[in-house]
């Protein structure tokens, strides 16, 4: 909606619940996500990577190891998933990102020949998993007071 109401340059951050079919130790059927978008002239994937590094380093410190993997999201092109190396030595996906698909821009009456954008979605529960060494994301929703009391 924000892209329909404003003209570039524009930037938005929003948060909310996301629903999907996944349910395992690293995926929930409902999770909380912070999303961001930035649209202006000449926005590049290099700018997106720089922003992601700044976000991750601000959350976990400069010593955290991360990697970008090619991925697919219909609203970004190209798309990537970003993984962080956990304390246990396993890679854990923490966010999805990419350059805004030109079709999305055009559908918002933004000239995709003049403007481009970047977007990302960051899972809040994943941040908590990594910061606190939690191995099963479902623990956050089991009502186990012994587990939950450590997060006061």
PLM regions with names:
Residues 1-152:
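TRNA-recognition modules of translation machinery and tRNA-sensing kinases, especially anticodon-binding
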């Amino acid at each position: 909606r924000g892209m329909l109401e404003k003209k570039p340059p524009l930037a938005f951050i929003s948060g909310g619940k996301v629903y999907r079919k996944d349910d395992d130790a690293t995926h929930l059927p409902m999770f909380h996500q912070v999303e961001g978008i930035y649209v202006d002239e000449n926005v590049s994937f290099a700018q997106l990577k720089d922003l992601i590094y700044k976000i991750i380093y601000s959350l976990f410190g400069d010593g955290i190891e991360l990697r970008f993997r090619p991925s697919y999201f219909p609203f970004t092109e190209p798309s990537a998933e970003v993984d962080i190396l956990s304390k246990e030595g396993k890679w854990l996906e923490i966010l999805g990102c990419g350059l805004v698909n030109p079709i999305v821009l055009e559908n918002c009456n933004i000239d995709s020949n003049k403007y481009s954008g970047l977007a990302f979605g960051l899972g809040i529960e994943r941040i908590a998993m990594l910061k606190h060494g939690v191995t099963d994301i479902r623990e956050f929703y089991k009502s186990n007071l012994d587990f939950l009391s450590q997060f006061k």
